[in-house]
Amino acid sequence: MNSIQENEHVTVFREFLKIRTDHPTPDYESSTKFLVEKAKEYNIPYEVYRETGTPIVLMKIEGLEPNLKTVLLNSHVDVVPAVHDSWKVDPFSAWKDESGNIFGRGTQDMKCVCMQFLEVARRIVQSGQKLKRTLHLSFVPDEEIGGSGKGMEKFVYTEKFRQLNIGLCLDEGLASPTNDFTVFYGERAPWWVHITAVGNAGHGSRFIEGTAIEKLMRTINKMLAFRQEQFESLHHGQHECGKKLGDVTSLNLTVLKAGIPIDHSNNFSYNVIPTQAEAGFDIRIPPTVNLDQFLDQIKEWTAEEGLSFKFASYIPKNEMTKLDSDNKWWENFKESCKKMDINLVTEIFPAATDSRFIRNLGIPAFGFSPINNTPILLHDHNEFLNEKVYLRGIDIFMGIIPNLVNME
Ligand SMILES: [Zn+2]
Ligand SMILES: [Zn+2]
C-alpha cells in the first residue's frame, strides 16, 4: 500500500508493532527509546523508572487540582512470542492488506491501546486545555509472563506508584466480534496446583494396595467431576442466563508425571509400581467465588493419606470493581459511551491482566480495548486489527478519558 496516503497515527502504530518486545527476550530498551522520543515530540512530561529492574515509562499531564485522585492509563509493551511459520506474513512487519487490516503480534494485545493512550495524551497537551485531575500513563514490561515479571506486579508496591495517587485505572480488555464493546471489571484468579501422591511399591505382577497412582487417580477423578459440573453450567448458561467463561471456574489437568525411568533413557520399568505420582492443574476462579472456601475444597480433594499439594501460582485475594451507581467513575464512563452510541457489555476477564494488581489495592480498574467487529485473536496466529477500528478507538478514548479526568 502507498504509505504516503496513510494516516499518521496508523504509521506510528505500525512502527511500534515492529519493535521486538516479544518474549522470551523482549527488547525493552527499544520500546523505551521509542516512547521517550514520542513524549519529547508531543511535549508530554515523562520519566523512565527502572527500580523494578526493567524500564517502565511514565508520562504525566498535571491537572488543575493535583491533590485529587488521578486517572492512570496503563498498558503493557511486551507481547507473546509468534510462531513465524504459522503466520501468513512476518508477525513483526506490521503488514497491511488492501482493506486496511494490519497484521502483527500485539495489534490487539495490546500495542494498539498503548499507542491510542499516547495519542490521547498528545491531543490533550496540544489542546492547551487544563483538565481538573492529573492524568498518568504507564507503559509497563512483563505482563505476559505473569508472576515472575518485573512489571506492574512489582511496581504497585513501590513508593513511586503510591505517589501517583490513582483513583481509577484503565487497562486492556478484549476485542469484541460483535458491534458491542466489552468492559471488564474483574478477572479470574489463576491458581496452579501441584499434587504429589506417595504410596506403596511392589512388583507389577501383584495386586498392590494403596499405590501412589491409585490415590492420585481418585483425586484427579474428583477434580474432573467438578470440571464437568462447571463446564455444564457454562454450556447451560449460554441458553439460559448468558453465563460466560469468566463466570465459571475452569480446571484443566496440565501436568501428569509417574513411572520409573530406566537409566536416563525414555524407557520405563513397566513392572515396577512407582512410589510417587504427580499431577498439576491450571484452575481459574472467578471473583464471585470465595477463595478461602475454594482452598478448603482443594484440601478436601487432597485429604487422603499420602497426598499433598503445593501452589505453583497462587493469589489469596481477587478483588473486582463494583459497577453500581456508587461508583462515580463507572457512571461517568457509561455516560460518555452512551453519548457516543456505544453499547457496552460488562464481563469478567477469562484470563489474567495487570488490572488484578491494581484492583487488589482497592483501586477500581476497567479493562477496555475499543475494538469491535473484530475476531478475538490475542496470542493467536495472524493477529490483526483494521486501521479504521484503530483510529475510531482513539476517538472513543477521546470521548471517555477527558470526562473521567475532569470528573468532580
Ligand atoms: Zn495483554
Ligand atoms: Zn496477552
UniProtKB/Swiss-Prot annotation:
Cofactor(s) for this UniProt protein: Zn(2+)
Chief location: cytoplasm
The UniProt record lists the keyword Metal-binding: yes
Catalytic activity as recorded in UniProt: an N-acyl-L-amino acid + H2O = an L-alpha-amino acid + a carboxylate; an N-acetyl-L-cysteine-S-conjugate + H2O = an S-substituted L-cysteine + acetate
InterPro entries: Aminoacylase-1_M20A, ArgE/DapE_CS, Bact_exopeptidase_dim_dom, N-acyl_aa_amidohydrolase, Peptidase_M20, Peptidase_M20_dimer
GO molecular function annotations of the record: aminoacylase activity; metal ion binding
Localisation: Cytoplasm
Free-text cofactor note: Binds 2 Zn(2+) ions per subunit.
Its EC number(s): 3.5.1.14
Keyword presence, Cytoplasm: yes
GO biological process: one example: amino acid metabolic process
Entries under SUPFAM superfamilies matching the protein: Bacterial exopeptidase dimerisation domain (SSF55031), Zn-dependent exopeptidases (SSF53187)
UniProt-annotated catalytic positions: 78, 143
Entry keywords, A to Z: Cytoplasm, Hydrolase, Metal-binding, Zinc
Binding site for Zn(2+) 1: 76, 109, 172
Self-association state and partner proteins as the record states: Homodimer.
Protein purpose: Involved in the hydrolysis of N-acylated or N-acetylated amino acids (except L-aspartate).
Alphabetized PANTHER family for the sequence: AMINOACYLASE-1 (PTHR45892:SF1)
Family (UniProt): Belongs to the peptidase M20A family.
Descriptive protein name: Aminoacylase-1
Gene: acy1
